[in-house]
Amino acid sequence: MKEKIVLAYSGGLDTSVAVKWLIDKGYDVVAVCLDVGEGKDLDVVYSKALDMGAVECHIIDATKEFSDDFVSYAIKGNLMYENSYPLVSALSRPLIAKKLVEIAEQTNSVGIAHGCTGKGNDQVRFEVAIKALNPNLKAFAPVREWGWSREEEIDYAIKHNIPVGINHDSPYSIDQNLWGRANECGILEDPYAAPPKDAYDLTAELEDTPDTPDEIILSFKNGVPVQLNHQDYDLDQLILTLNELAGKHGIGRIDHVENRLAGIKSREIYETPGAEVILKAHKALETLTLTKDVAHFKPVIEKQFAEQTYNGLWFSPLTDSLKLFIDSTQQYVEGDVRIKLFKGNAIVNGRKSLYTLYDEKLATYTKEDAFNQSAAVGFIDIYGLPTQVNAYLHGGYSNE
């Protein structure tokens, strides 16, 4: 009896070529494809995997689990790698790894294969997550073992009649889920080259966007959006709805050169219309509900959490601790945020909360002012005392 290997199967170039390669190596291939909200035709993926020779193909709808258990933390934690990338692909990898391990254990497979190259982030994310969940499973990386270029993979696919939907003229590598879309390769590898129109799919060109804005209200509870325009939504459906609504206004385009885990720089094109709207709204609400010290310290945790996620360390003691901190800050992040969507911009123009720490009577400069301005004298004396003592000792700072 042949040994079984579970393959993370997307139906794209790398994993389609990997099916044939693993079969030629003498393994039975168990293909696994997760739906995490990318809008892919899963019936086609299922049939394609079996046509390629896989002995089984498991299609798993994980969209809700992805949104509730992973994307929710990206929202509560305002997660952005290098202040630019909202972790579109990185967020889905631990969930995919989790499901791969579950299928491997159910089918008595000896290991798990993926279609990642030897210089990308995903090889690390998958293999570290798999070892964290089941250290006895072997990892197989056919594309890394070949060391082939993308052109050589395409040639191999053409030679063996493997349908992959791309060619030498359009060699994009695309990854998509409900949190956004990532695109690389081809002309995008030149960081000075303007992305062609066909590099985008979720967002409209600015010249094609409506000349009338849309104004929406997002309602949050415990740091997560639960309503759009006062209508209840599950998180996954709310994100998908915002992707369409914000996308038509050209919102969410990111052209970013990022520092990969493997030490190289990579130019990536991201489209994250729903994510941009939600994250802006969430940050706006936090300005009302977080105390000053929490608001100033939380970004330190957010940065570490984003790097943990990007670097494939979701299943780790540190990440568990970071999640606990983030959750502890979100108890009172509840309220409404009003946002205008127009010409590539998501503009926050109002926010309110029952738990607001903003006191208009303390903030106002009108006669309704309740702030005790005379208290400022003593505060300034005490606050500035170290500076004053230093000046007495050293003669003060020169104006020169």
Swiss-Prot record:
Which CDD domains does this one have? Answer: ASS
Alphabetically, which GO biological process terms does the record hold?
Answer: argininosuccinate metabolic process; L-arginine biosynthetic process; urea cycle
Q: Which domain of life is it from?
A: Bacteria
Q: Does the keyword Cytoplasm apply?
A: yes
Q: Where does L-citrulline bind?
A: Y85, N121, R125, S173, E258, Y270
Where it sits in the cell: the answer is: Cytoplasm
Catalysed reaction equations from the record = L-citrulline + L-aspartate + ATP = 2-(N(omega)-L-arginino)succinate + AMP + diphosphate + H(+)
Pathway the protein contributes to: Amino-acid biosynthesis; L-arginine biosynthesis; L-arginine from L-ornithine and carbamoyl phosphate: step 2/3
Q: Which GO terms describe its molecular function?
A: argininosuccinate synthase activity; ATP binding
Instruction: Write out the residues that bind ATP.
Output: A8, Y9, S10, G11, G12, L13, D14, T15, S16, G115
Top-rank EC class of the record's enzyme: ligase
Q: Which residues bind L-aspartate?
A: T117, N121, D122
**Gene Ontology annotations for the cellular component aspect, listed alphabetically:** cytoplasm
Could you describe the subunit structure of this protein?
Homotetramer.
Task: Report the NCBIfam families cross-referenced here.
Answer: argG, PRK00509.1
What HAMAP family does the database record attribute to this sequence?
A: Arg_succ_synth_type1
Concerning its family, UniProt says: Belongs to the argininosuccinate synthase family. Type 1 subfamily.
Q: What name does UniProt use for this protein?
A: Argininosuccinate synthase
Supply the source organism for this entry. Answer: Staphylococcus haemolyticus (strain JCSC1435)
Q: Which lineage ranks, top first, belong to the organism behind this chain?
A: Bacteria, Bacillati, Bacillota, Bacilli, Bacillales
Q: Which gene encodes it?
A: argG
